[in-house]
């Protein structure tokens, strides 16, 4: 089974933490590859995999667009239509309903909560 990882973890810099040294792997957003780093053994963040295979399974380059789309705040856009939509709120860590105006905005919009959760959780 694939490891369940917060999809946004792949886009933060690795954090070594303050404790003892352990060899780990992190996903480098710039190179879209998994790289070795020395982890302190405590604290740190979720961009931290015990093996290169675990890192690769959690942070595939093809997930970049979807993950970055979910980081943007849902935008209503300048038009005046009344279209209830769902967007992912990365601060709350959940999908929220908002009113889309029908034009512009961004790609963080889904017709159902289920579609939003499937893309962004």
Curated annotation (Swiss-Prot):
SMART domains: KU. One of its GO terms (biological process) is envenomation resulting in negative regulation of voltage-gated potassium channel activity in another organism. One of its GO terms (cellular component) is extracellular space. Gene3D superfamilies: Pancreatic trypsin inhibitor Kunitz domain. Its main location: secreted. The record marks 20-21, 80-81 as: Reactive bond. InterPro entries: Kunitz_BPTI (IPR002223), Kunitz_BPTI_sf (IPR036880), Prtase_inh_Kunz-CS (IPR020901), TFPI/VKTCI-like (IPR050098). Highly expressed in gut. Low-level expression in salivary gland and ovary. Not detected in fat body and hemocytes. Residues 10-59, 61-111 form the BPTI/Kunitz inhibitor domain. Keywords: Disulfide bond, Glycoprotein, Protease inhibitor, Repeat, Secreted, Serine protease inhibitor. GO terms for molecular function: serine-type endopeptidase inhibitor activity. Disulfide bonds join 10-59, 19-42, 34-55, 70-120, 79-103, 95-116. It is found in: Secreted. N-glycosylated. PANTHER family: BPTI_KUNITZ INHIBITOR DOMAIN-CONTAINING PROTEIN, KUNITZ-TYPE PROTEASE INHIBITOR-RELATED. Serine protease inhibitor. Inhibits bovine trypsin, bovine chymotrypsin, human plasmin, human plasma kallikrein and human neutrophil elastase, but not bovine thrombin, human factor Xa or porcine pancreatic kallikrein. Reduces cell viability and inhibits capillary tube formation in vitro probably by reducing bradykinin release. May play a role in blocking blood coagulation during the larvae fixation on cattle. This is Kunitz-type serine protease inhibitor A. It comes from Rhipicephalus microplus (Cattle tick).
């Amino acid at each position: 089974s694939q490891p369940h990882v917060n999809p946004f973890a792949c886009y933060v810099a690795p954090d070594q933490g303050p404790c003892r040294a352990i060899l780990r792997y992190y996903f480098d957003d710039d190179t879209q590859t998994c790289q070795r780093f020395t982890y302190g053994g405590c604290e740190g963040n979720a961009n931290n995999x015990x093996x290169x295979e675990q890192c690769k399974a959690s942070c595939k380059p093809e997930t970049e667009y979807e993950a970055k789309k979910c980081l943007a705040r849902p935008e209503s856009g300048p038009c005046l239509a009344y279209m209830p939509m769902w967007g992912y709120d990365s601060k709350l860590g959940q999908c929220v309903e908002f009113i889309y105006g029908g034009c512009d905005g961004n790609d963080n919009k889904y017709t159902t909560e289920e579609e939003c959760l499937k893309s962004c959780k």
